[in-house]
């Protein structure tokens, strides 16, 4: 009996060992089933290997498999299902494989005209269908079910990548343009724009603190066909219209026609619940703040959110534009999904000019960009993470762990601010002054203040030129003063924020923000990864590998430069001529890049592409801001070139709708017939001393060249070989006499070598 018991135990041990070999210690595969498209490949990880591994397809007409170094690679051959087996010395594993038919597009290429569209059918879609245009200045693309609509924007060739979860296909697109864009119909041209290219706001919640309110500004100028500005006898209105695409250039048709709520809907923001406590102003819901006149205690009337009802704009004689200051548009569309209001960073409005009889003279469509992607939650949100960079901002007494995520990171910031500053006499003095001005502020700190129901306005202590009264040419947020009228030594908001965070380690890159030379550092706090604020012709420029040629630091310098005490935030800004001067490239916009000795814009001697000095004329300061500068025919620079950070042609197609409408292609409004009935003949009377273009210039340019005009280098380069500034915008046919007829495609850089052997041919 004893021997039988021993034998039985021995038997159990053998069974257990075999079980371990065949199961616990046997090879494992991940994933255990897989889907792959025809022609596509996928990998299967193999672990716990014992001995030689063999991988076999049970139907190689459907799927093939190879194995190397712990990884089996399967490749789809044709649609169907088949199993593959993966075996080692101990066990065999079976992996079911589904091969889906490759995604296909019909037709595989399209040829359309500018402003025309074509539909393309997509079949064999697996999962989510996506479509991306390689060049949105030539063609844009939108999706509806399994149909792609391609729209011609500018003449040229491009491609559209169509993909789903397992495969992709390429659609070739040709957009045909006319030799010259047709003149705008009618006798007027209307140009409208947003002043900054992107406005930021705090988002949904204003109950804890506020950096920036919803505040957007719309400008417009009207030209008649004699090229003169129309400044009287017209009315100007704006109204909400659906945009064409979202930030990813995918068709959405979003509408943003209110900023509070409709009926019993949840409000898009609680801003109007706190305007009185924050700013001492109490506009009705849907009416925004207006800083103009506030410096002298007489603010102008606020303007409403865009709606389906046209709202009036007013004429500003000083700046010679029609304006709607402080429009309180939010980054939330009227449409909702399961998470609430859908984000809409590019609300669209239509501006309409009418005569005194109500006849429409001209219309323009533009965006009022706004983003709440200006959050600090990446470092200040309560978290259980142990990432040293992510918890560096954790208050010593712990996170607040507020269940309201919109309030949580803000309360953490105030808690940390109190923790680090409350013992300082300057901080105590500031709290005392705030309390004397508004009893809602507590002398015990800013977090107790917010928790008691009084939201904190950051710029109440930290001066900011972002709050600018352009009527009185001064900031309305100049910091705190004591009872003797002396200002407290509290650093301005722009300076303190950039200096303080220059040494902060980005949790994602583990690099100090100041060390970064690309836009990821700025996009950590500024509207970035989703909004794509820096989207203009410079911001979208890339290398052959797809890397950005320019970043925020290219113009503004690093964070220490932006926060340098020598510069005035929002006043000392880089200017066009800082880089664009003397016909040379690779210029630097500001001093101190790398050494941060100054951080102020470089002012060259050459002002061909200059903004205007002392615009606006601020006493004691000498700004020359692009958004206040004018050029050819009294037009604002932004009217023709586009808003700051969104210079034409923009990466976001909705920005380009207006320039396409007035001249037939996306880009700087550069075609004379956009504003003039006929093309003027001039040697240097155009914008920036520009000459006439087209056939009329063929004979005239000879005299200009003989006179040794140095102006040629500004656009054609110091070697006269052409630059992007000499590129034509749409395909043109030019008769150059003895040199024949030239057919130049859009984008061709005209140079002396286009017809001659250089600038001084024999």
Give the role of each language-model region:
Residues 2-12:
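Bacterial N-terminal signal peptides that target proteins for export
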Residues 11-21:
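Bacterial N-terminal signal peptides
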Residues 26-43, 93-117, 169-218, 223-255, ...:
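Short S/T/G/P-enriched beta-strand
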Residues 74-76, 150-152, 314-345:
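Short, hydrophobic beta-strand segments
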Residues 328-371, 383, 460-469:
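Ser/Thr/Pro-rich, low-complexity mucin-like regions
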